[in-house]
Amino acid sequence: MKICGLLAVLALLAIAGSAKADDLGCISTTFKLLSPNDKVCISDFDDPRVPGVACHISQARKGGWGQPFGLNEDPSNFSVACRQVGPISVDLSKLPENEEAFSQKTSIFFKATRIYRMIDAKRNTLIYVAISSKIINGSPENAISTVPIMPWGGK
């Protein structure tokens, strides 16, 4: 029983550490007469550990009859763009070298798009890498965005 409780706490901590995205909109890429269209959707999120960084993600989403019920597995097609949108005052040396900043389920079972933040201390730059993961195997598809940390408004 203690193990189940510990696993539940660890799962909640893992979920709490990642940012949640807001959907900004979608563009249909195919026409399906009697079911939802395939589309590309744009979402945004703020890095939860680095205030002053915002990212936008475009992801392919599969239409069809499974889509309204969350039964479709979205393809591993995505891109990410992250930018400095305000002052960044976090001490990079206190951040992990590799940490998940965002995760979004892309199927009802075990598949997710994840964005990890890495640090290039030599160049004072944050690196965001998007991947698709599954419990058994993921996809080699990936995307990268870099955020050089610049002075902001005299700070």
Model-inferred region functions:
Residues 7-14:
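Bacterial N-terminal signal peptides
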Residues 122-155:
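C-terminal partner/receptor-binding element of secreted or periplasmic proteins
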Residues 54-121:
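Mature extracytoplasmic domains of secretory-pathway proteins
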Residues 1-7:
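Bacterial N-terminal signal peptides that target proteins for export
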Residues 17-21:
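Sec/Tat signal peptide C-region and signal peptidase I cleavage site
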Residues 22-75, 79:
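N-terminal secretory signal peptides
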Residues 42-45, 80-82, 116, 128-129, ...:
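Generic structural hydrophobic/aromatic packing signal, biased to beta-strands
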Residues 48-51, 121-125:
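Short, solvent-exposed coil/turn segments at beta-strand boundaries
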